C-alpha cells in the first residue's frame, strides 16, 4: 500500500512540472553575447581610426605652425635688414643735404657781401634807409630760389631791422594747421600769422638772431633773445638750432626744444609716445612734449588760466597760462643799426 502511494506522488509531480517539455535557453544567450562582442569590436575599430586621424591632424597642425613661425622669423630678419639699410641711406642723404645747406649758406654770404644792392630781408631794407615799421615786399631771388615775399618789418625795436616770422595778438587765426600750411605760411601779415617754415629756412641761411616778445593779460612785457637761430630744410623736418639765451623772461623755455624737429597734427615727429601736436593743438618743435607752446590755442581773458594747450612760456607763468601777445622776429647776426 505504501509503495503505491509513493508512485502516485512521483507521477503527480512529474505531470505538474513537465521539465521535459521546456525548451533550453543556453543557445539564445550565446547568440546575444556574440552580437555584443561584434559591436564592441566595431566601436574599438572606429575609436582607433579617429585617434589615428586626430594624431595625423595634430602632427600636420604642428608642422604648419612651425612653418609659419619660421616664415615670420625670416620676414622679421628681412625687415630689420631693410630698416638698417634704409636708416643708413637716410643718414647719408641727410648728411649730403646738410653739406648742400652749408654750401648754399656760404654762397649766400658771399652774395650778401658782394651785392650791395640786394634785398634779402628787413635788415637789407633798413640799410637802404627804410626806417618805418610795416609791410614790405621782398623781391624774388633766383639764386636762393625764393619767390617774392610779403613781410612785416620792425624797424624800431632794439635797433630795428627785424623780420617778423610769427605773431599772436587777436586770436582770429587758428594755428592748429597741417604740415603744408606751416610750410608755406598762413594768416594775415598785419594780424596773426606764421611766415612759413620754408621762408624761415631760407632767411636763416645766413647766421641770424631770434627775438621772442611776450605779453601777459596783466600788461607785463618780457623778451628772450638767442644769439643764433636757424631752421634746417624740409628733408630735415625744419630742425631748430638755437644759440645762447639772454633776456628778462626768466627760465629759457626754448632750450628744451633746441635741436628738435617740427611737428604738426598730421606729421608726428616729436620724441614722445604721445602725439604732442594733437595734444597741444599747434605746430611746433615739440620734444616730449614742451616747455613752451607759442603756436598753441589763443585763449582770451577769463579762459587763459584753464588749459594746457594755450600760448605758453613755462618759465614765466607756467603751463596753464595762455599769453595775450607773442611775436617772433629775426635779423642777421652781423646787422648793425
Swiss-Prot record:
GO biological process, one term: negative regulation of vasculature development involved in avascular cornea development in camera-type eye
Any one Gene Ontology molecular-function term assigned to this protein's record: identical protein binding
Disulfide bonds: 122-153, 276-289
Region forming the signal peptide: 1-21
Pfam families xrefs: Fibrinogen_C
Alphabetized UniProt keyword annotations: Coiled coil, Disulfide bond, Glycoprotein, Secreted, Signal
Glycosylation site positions: 49, 244, 258, 320
Cellular localization per UniProt: Secreted
Domain named Fibrinogen C-terminal: residues: 113-334
Keyword Coiled coil: yes
Coiled coil: 30-110
SMART domains: FBG (SM00186)
GO cellular component, one term: extracellular region
Keyword Transport among UniProt keywords: no
Stored PANTHER family: FIBRINOGEN ALPHA CHAIN (PTHR47221:SF6)
Function summary: Has a role in the formation and organization of the extracellular matrix. In the eye, it functions as a mediator of dexamethasone-induced matrix deposition in the trabecular meshwork, the tissue responsible for the outflow of the ocular aqueous humor and for the maintenance of intraocular pressure. Is a negative regulator of angiogenesis in the cornea, and plays a major role in maintaining corneal avascularity and transparency.
SUBUNIT field: Homotetramer; disulfide-linked.
Name the record gives this protein: Angiopoietin-related protein 7
Protein's organism: Mus musculus
Taxonomic lineage from the root: Eukaryota, Metazoa, Chordata, Craniata, Vertebrata
Name of the coding gene: Angptl7
